[in-house]
Amino acid sequence: MWHRVIALMIKEFLALLKDKKGRMVFIGPPIIQLIVFGYAATFDLNQVPYAVFNEDSGAAARQFLQRVEGSPAFRLAGHLGNDGQIAPLLDTRKVLMVLHIGPRFTEDLLLRRPAPLQVIIDGRNSNTAMLLAGYMRTILTRFNQEWAEAKGYSPPPAKLNIRAWFNPNLQSRWFIVPGIVGLLTLVVTVMVTALSVAREREAGTFDQLLVTPLRPVEILLGKAFPGIAIGFLEANLIILIAVFWFHIPLRGNLVALYIGLFLFLLSVIGVGLMISSIAVTQQQGLLGGFLFLVPSIILSGFATPIANMPQTVQYLTLINPMRYFLVILRSLFLEGGSAFLLWPEYWPMAIIGVVNLALAAWLFRHRMY
């Protein structure tokens, strides 16, 4: 049995290697996508244009504005002479934020009265607006503390000291890049297997495969192993780029990583083989792959926390292997998790993998003729 399966595996690898378009799709784009997404997909603010409408010539206003200018998150676009200039700048997106300091800002602070400070933010992008508000709140809090210390005022009764574990500088890239590792591994593996049988049908060689001594289960195994091998190699290459190019720390156990990777590949291989069993042409295989990939990524917690989703949608995520693999990746990269701690993520993927492969085998037997 196994020598026939190995022969079919070799045939599959040769077919992939001979296909120039396939080589380019499965090797080049994932690497390029990782590098592009690693730099472009970030929640950090950098060089956000803002304008200042300052009606106060006092020292406090100057000190506060110096703090804002010194932050790499902001870029001063200009000073305004009147409030009528605010709306045109925000309407045309020349600035995303306007700081308005009233004429009595310094006087109010010296007299220990509340000193209003207006921050006008472009709210069309709610995520950026919330980040801007958070950045400004942090700058203002530090300014208030240092102003009180410099003037000898009594400190506030409670002081917030924040310490971030696992990601001390709160770099969003440390969160996003491990997720991209899982995303690209999913895309490549599903596409390789989704096109495997469809490619044979389109080329007219699938009928020849059926008259060989190979049994259906042997054909299925021969189609599955190349996808697992390519997914494994692709994942390792992407992990190396994440660690050595983006300097994302890999603190966890490699054994725990490869257990999770193997179970994840089994889960998505089953989906790919189901799609390939149904598809008659490669175009149908591609379409079926994308129909699976889009909800799988959205419901994985890659960009939005699963806890923020409606309860019904949260139940749907329980059958998504990507959900569990992302937890494994981020735990191993940032937390230094072990296989024992990740057991709650392993067993659901194992069950999903067994069910998917069983369904793929059933579909394959009923669709092979």
What would you call each of these model-derived segments?
Residues 1-174, 341:
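Extracytoplasmic/periplasmic domains immediately adjacent to an N-terminal transmembrane anchor
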Residues 16, 20, 190-214, 224, ...:
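Transmembrane helix boundary and interhelical loop/hinge segments in multi-pass membrane proteins
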Residues 28, 36-45, 280-322:
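Transmembrane helix segments
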Residues 40-44, 194, 198-199, 212, ...:
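Short helix-capping/hinge motifs at transmembrane helix termini and TM-loop junctions
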Residues 166-170, 249, 301-356, 363:
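Membrane-interfacial helix-loop-helix junctions in multi-pass membrane proteins
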Residues 176-193:
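Long, hydrophobic alpha-helical segments
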Residues 216-289, 294, 340-346, 350, ...:
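Alpha-helical transmembrane segments and their short interhelical loops
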Residues 362-369:
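Short cytosolic juxtamembrane segments of multi-pass membrane proteins
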